[in-house]
Design a protein with these regions (language model features):
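Short coil/turn segments at secondary-structure boundaries
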Residues: 104-105
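A generic structural signal for short hydrophobic patches within well-formed alpha-helices
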Residues: 98-99, 108-111, 115
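Short S/T/G/P-rich N-terminal loop/turn motif that feeds into the first structured element of a domain
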Residues: 1-86, 94-101, 120-229
């Protein structure tokens, strides 16, 4: 069992056993918090900080091999919760099953040692790509706001420069349940979006390194014949 979170085995089972005709691309979204120093379990930090251990983990070659794509990656510059998040990462997997099958690959398990050493706690959850609704194409974004929220109403219409998607399950977390991910692309003078309609939330403001979200959502919309805006 990993030290950095609780596995939802019910959701893991749904990912592994999703019928092929119902399966398809899924965003696996990672909220990440690192140890100050890596902990390899033998009293050694490997000469790395927690963040550096996670950099060593980065399984880019494995993702390429299974047809997965890094959809987003960035550093948190304003954490508006008490959780202390450091990074946000999103990977689009071609299917839910491919995410589960990756866990048993030897090359992935070898790299995962570094994630185990570097990660203090994380939330990892799935959002079906074809169900993400995206408003009109955003202009230049100085920062991106990620709001992981829980509420009792249905998925709303995204505001301008925003995308929203339903959370279908949380594979790794702290036991809380989430219903929606909201992503807002903001210019330098834009205010943070309101959050007065939610029961729980994890909000972070992020400086982007990689952002392919809207391109991947548009491709999924085209494949399903359902516009995302």
């Amino acid at each position: 069992m990993p030290r950095y979170g609780m596995i939802d085995f019910d959701y893991a089972g749904r990912l592994a056993n999703c019928p092929p005709d119902e399966d398809g691309p899924v965003f696996m979204v990672n909220y990440m918090n690192y140890r100050e120093r890596a902990d390899y379990g033998d009293g050694s930090d490997g000469g790395r900080s927690g963040r550096e251990a996670d950099d060593e983990y980065a399984p880019v070659d494995v993702l390429d091999d299974i047809g997965a794509v890094v959809a987003y990656f960035g550093d948190v510059i304003d954490d508006q919760t008490s959780t202390g998040w450091h990074r946000i990462g999103i990977v689009q997997y071609p299917t839910r099953r491919s995410f589960i099958e990756m866990q048993s690959r030897r090359d992935f398990r070898d790299k995962h040692t570094h994630k185990e050493a570097g990660m203090d706690h994380t939330i990892v959850f799935g959002v079906p790509v074809h169900l993400v609704r995206s408003a009109s194409e955003a202009g230049h974004a100085d920062r991106v706001v990620f709001d992981l929220v829980r509420h009792e109403r249905g998925l709303g219409t995204p505001a301008p420069q925003q995308a929203t998607g339903p959370v279908e399950g949380t594979i790794m977390g702290d036991g809380r349940t989430w219903t929606e991910l909201r992503i807002s692309w903001l210019g330098a003078g834009d205010d943070l979006p309101p959050l007065d309609d939610v029961d729980d939330r994890e909000r972070v403001v992020v400086r982007t390194s990689i952002d392919r979200i809207r391109t991947l959502v548009a491709a999924a919309d085209g494949a399903h014949g359902t516009p995302g805006s």
